[in-house]
């Protein structure tokens, strides 16, 4: 497969300059939907970490992590502008739509990256800042520039970038990394392949058109479906680990088990999906459920933590 070259969108005729692009256009560069998940899981890591952090410092930490995530999104859109212009799912993004020039997106992303890392280091903790810097580098250089266009395992390895936020939030409070923060990392890391391969199944045409070697395009639907089930099972097991390791209650464990079984159930629906199915309804259902699953798991961890704090505080 031939991957489209980045040069095909540079120097767009009639594209607006910095002063003509709206604030909304630049906000779209930050990938706000992805950022919301990053912010939520980082917040969970910060709250669940043992110790105390000043509320203002905590707010600053989450803001810096959000800006860093947005910077990664902007740099990803800068590099992927060529394939975004071809794929129906991404054709309306600011750069291929002609609202922002590629070089402006690059400058915007680099500026936000430096700002988020430096402020997080100065105001909160340099280990957390280092993890944020590594996350930005990993997502942009390792995943976007290398893995995404070179291997069907791009999501498996590249998924690490999306799994770091709770670990960064944890480090903001404790100044370190622990088994608990690694478990939070693993939940997202193992969740990522099933989530994105479900999307890749019903967007095979888009990925095939631009030569991105996603699992369904390179290895076929059958292999992808089996891999989805494997990662769904691994995700379900990792979701229960907080209880197994003693930092979440049996109530959380029961909830995580039910959600995990739901994840596996939807993945089995994908496995049973006929080869060449054009509608891909089971894949779309799994994709939607996977998003709900991750938000539900981290929400349950926060609720479980709040209940434990109330109980230990003698309020009930």
From Swiss-Prot:
Pfam families: UbiA. It is a multi-pass membrane protein. Keywords: Cell inner membrane, Cell membrane, Heme biosynthesis, Membrane, Transferase, Transmembrane, Transmembrane helix. It catalyses: heme b + (2E,6E)-farnesyl diphosphate + H2O = Fe(II)-heme o + diphosphate. The keyword Membrane applies. InterPro entries: Protohaem_IX_farnesylTrfase (IPR006369), UbiA_prenyltransferase (IPR000537), UbiA_prenylTrfase_CS (IPR030470), UbiA_sf (IPR044878). Its main location: membrane. It comes from the Bacteria. Its EC number is 2.5.1.141. One of its GO terms (cellular component) is plasma membrane. The chain crosses the membrane at residues 34-54, 55-75, 95-115, 118-138, 155-175, 182-202, 228-250, 254-273, 287-307. One of its GO terms (molecular function) is protoheme IX farnesyltransferase activity. One of its GO terms (biological process) is heme O biosynthetic process. It is found in: Cell inner membrane. PROSITE patterns: UBIA (PS00943). Pathway: Porphyrin-containing compound metabolism; heme O biosynthesis; heme O from protoheme: step 1/1. Converts heme B (protoheme IX) to heme O by substitution of the vinyl group on carbon 2 of heme B porphyrin ring with a hydroxyethyl farnesyl side group. Carbon 2 of the heme B porphyrin ring is defined according to the Fischer nomenclature. Belongs to the UbiA prenyltransferase family. Protoheme IX farnesyltransferase subfamily. PANTHER family: 4-HYDROXYBENZOATE SOLANESYLTRANSFERASE, PROTOHEME IX FARNESYLTRANSFERASE, MITOCHONDRIAL. This is Protoheme IX farnesyltransferase. The gene is ctaB.
